[in-house]
Amino acid sequence: MQLARSDSLCGCGSAIARLLIGLLAPVVLLLSTAEYASAQTLVHVKDTGVLRVGYRQDAQPFSYQDATAGAKGYSVALCQKIADAVKEKLQLPEIRTELVPVASEDDGVDAVRQGKIDLQCGATTATLGRRENVAFSIPIFPSGVGALMRKDAPVRMREILEGRPEPEQPRWRASLALIFQKRVFAVRAESTEEKWLREGVKKFHIIADIVPVADYGAGVDSIVERRADVLFGDRTVLLGAAARSSSADDLMVVERRFTNENLALALSRGDEDFRLLVDRTLSGLYSSGEIAELYKSFFGEPDEDALSFFRMNALPE
């Protein structure tokens, strides 16, 4: 009887053990998956010898396709520094940086989320909405929305966009909505600038046409050909697009920056080892002053505001 009871107890214990294993297995698997995710990029690079970098082909000077040298730009150069740091961290004799074109910043963010690329190196604004899907490095550049137009644009429209106060004469006492009524605003499709523009037009009750364009080149063409009155976009990118236009002498980018946004590099959420390496690499460039030479290559000599931005965003060791 005792033996039978012992067998019964063993059977019961085995059943309980199997039940516990069944209950705990998903938890163990989840923990293992999370642990792997935190190191997924470095593990992938160590296994394959490849770091996959997404870049925009039309976001000069941040990232663009050069006819002879391939992908170039400020963000691309930063990502190459990060690739060098990955190589050193993993003690690999060589790694290959695979450059993957993306159509827009949101496409790049989605590619990071899906694991198609390891790092998005473009002109990506770090927003809360995007942080639902990806993580971001420390800021790499201070940016914001700017406006490009023809130099012969209506004077009052230009003055308002430049932020000048209204003159006191009664003839200038027109509302914002009236001055911009039936104007055509071009903006890059599916961008943070498009969202900002649509919200602004609605807020100020402006009756205007918003025309999304595929890229900055198409937007500049719409201004040159008078199909649009104003092109809104990242101010730094607008400056580059205007300078490259064959009608550059007819174009201007207003001094005003309508928003203050930090650009950053997008990477996978939960990938803390890789994010630490990225932030440490960037902080090293900022703290050492090496960033000044890299900045100069794409934007000209950095002013005190730019240098202060890098000093403020460098993380201490």
What are these regions (language model features)?
Residues 39-123, 128, 132, 167, ...:
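Extracytoplasmic small-molecule ligand-binding "clamshell" domains
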Residues 87-101, 181-182, 201-214, 227, ...:
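A local structural motif
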Residues 55-59, 101-105, 115-127, 150-151, ...:
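Beta->alpha turn/N-cap motifs
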Residues 57, 140-156, 235, 242-282, ...:
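Periplasmic-binding protein-like
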Residues 40-42, 92-103, 124-126, 132-189:
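A conserved helix-loop-strand patch within extracytoplasmic ligand-binding domains
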Residues 17-32:
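Bacterial N-terminal signal peptides
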Residues 76-86, 150-174, 180-184, 191, ...:
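Extended ligand-binding regions for polar small-molecule ligands
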